[in-house]
Amino acid sequence: MVWKWMPLLLLLVCVATMCSAQDRTDLLNVCMDAKHHKTKPGPEDKLHDQCSPWKKNACCTASTSQELHKDTSRLYNFNWDHCGKMEPACKRHFIQDTCLYECSPNLGPWIQQVNQSWRKERFLDVPLCKEDCQRWWEDCHTSHTCKSNWHRGWDWTSGVNKCPAGALCRTFESYFPTPAALCEGLWSHSYKVSNYSRGSGRCIQMWFDSAQGNPNEEVARFYAAAMHVNAGEMLHGTGGLLLSLALMLQLWLLG
């Protein structure tokens, strides 16, 4: 008898799918729903050091930008120097990475919902400009770490991240043999290394000279437009399927 209910079940599934596809329509000039983010982007004249490029329009506050520059900040109690002192050139990339995460209002096309205690959203597969990834890896490959994924698996018993039992401190190059291994694996695929270069308008720059404007605005617009086109095509196809299922349901009810 279950088969008799199939048209109704399929109709409900399609409606739910279509509605979920329309849930998040704001892809431009948005902030993630996360631990330290503002609800809406806006000017922050006193953003600190590496976060200063976002001062005209930021999702972070000045105090957040100050705190994230510390070796062990109170934002997440994360210690960059968990395997000895990280090279300054290497740490600079991690601070810029954190500034991008906390401050950028241009990551909307890649925001995904997550079920985590400290945030409800994250970004996934942000197309990072290939030079940014290459320089990050080159400046860090002689620094040391004990893990290839920094999102999980730490020993937090002291309140600060420490290497888990049995994890050996080795060079970054040992844990991340290629630039892509670092940029894509470090934060569980928050980034995806792009084939595009800085200034192309097709990849996100981790850092930029604000005097020249924010190049990531153009990148976000491009990918948001592409996503809207794809969503429109999907909804157009779904509309035909819904009509067919509605007719099937009507015949089923009459029968």
UniProtKB/Swiss-Prot annotation:
It is found in: Cell membrane; Secreted. GO terms for molecular function: folic acid binding; folic acid receptor activity; signaling receptor activity. Residues 231-255 form a propeptide. GO terms for cellular component: cell surface; external side of plasma membrane; extracellular region; plasma membrane. A lipid is attached at N230 (GPI-anchor amidated asparagine). Folate binds at D97, Y101, W118, R119, K120, E121, R122, H151, R152, G153, W154, D155, W156, S190. Induction: Up-regulated by retinoic acid. The keyword RNA-binding does not apply. Its main location: membrane. Binds to folate and reduced folic acid derivatives and mediates delivery of 5-methyltetrahydrofolate and folate analogs into the interior of cells. Has high affinity for folate and folic acid analogs at neutral pH. Exposure to slightly acidic pH after receptor endocytosis triggers a conformation change that strongly reduces its affinity for folates and mediates their release. This is Folate receptor beta. The lineage of its organism: Eukaryota, Metazoa, Chordata, Craniata, Vertebrata.
